[in-house]
Amino acid sequence: MKKILLSITFALMGIVSGFAAKAYSGIVTVTQSDGTELNVRIYGDEHFNWLTTEDGVLLVKEGNNYYIAETTSYGTLKATKFIAHNANKRVSAEIKAIKKQNHSRFRSYAIEQASTAKAMGTGNNGVKYFPHSGSPKALVILVEFSDTTFQSGEKAKTVFEHFLKGNVEDALPDGYEAYTGSYMNKNLRNKGSVSDYFYDMSKGAYTPLFDVVGPYKLNHSSLYYGQGDKDNTDALVSDACKAADKDVDFSRYDADGDGMVDLVYIIYAGYPASMSGNPNDIWPQSGPGNGSFGTYDGKQVCRFGVHAELNFGWALNQKNGFLLSGIGLFCHEFSHTLGLPDLYPTVDASKVDNQNPEMWDLMDGGEYTYNGGYCPTPYSPWELDVMGWTSPVEL
């Protein structure tokens, strides 16, 4: 029975092409143009996502402000003229606009859109998963934009080499002081590197290697690649590979000789849309995409991952100092490149019996454990078994 269940699991995993990080489940505080602070919640993932106030009012972001949303006859959202406020600061006109929101209509639209988006990504396009044994090598490209640079500047390479493959006993790397919030507060630092996490999970059987290059400045703005619901990640991966091509021999990253680079990972300057509350930021994700991102040194780039430099969003970083990203998001998306699926619903689960593991599993909300993913939840026994890193006793 166990072997049958595992076979079904791998079959299901094989039909999914694109994965994305779950939205951060906590409160994100943003600052409106009138000087007020607004508490925002993020829902969904890269395929379909939306924003509400802390008490569930639907929002639309336009420019630098978050507005109370109007529900159209199709279930879509558009901004009203009312800047949103927390419940204790609303005037009567805002309350009237809120009462007109049709949550049921929007929920139906959200379910349809999320299902359609995921169906469009169906199919693994013959792209193999990244190996989950031994010491396979992945290429990591650091990129910044015309309007957004790494807080650590040219030292970003040193910072992210430590992030990916440093030892927990190592001193903080040169450049880490740029992340003032993490530098000054030990509770806002990673408790180990990505390599540490997978070494611990596999009991030493799996030690992925990460070659870090860059940072490279791309010609476009961050908004060009984020674009809210018009996510332009394909262009981000392609442009990053083109920028790195002069320095990288991509053929070194095709270990099995199938003509495809085993994995290219992009770490970009700025914030993740899954945590920032800004839908124009880029959403961390991974997958084989919908085709090749180009051919470099005779090898096609197909399997990719995307990760942000910083944790949370602009407002929190301005208040508490810049916060380096937690390894949790990276470990979650990297686990997708190994073949593990998401274990969370992306639409309103109020009509179903939600038995998801939430913060107890890396592939659900456990990517954000400990102040935003600085000490992510370990793999579950099922995930360890699927990866071949443990042999549970059958009862």
State each model region's role.
Residues 4, 19-303:
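Zymogen propeptides/activation segments of proteases
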Residues 6, 238-242, 328-336:
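A broad, structural surface signal
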Residues 7-15:
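Bacterial N-terminal signal peptides
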Residues 263-265, 269-395:
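Extracellular hydrolytic enzyme modules, especially secreted metalloproteases
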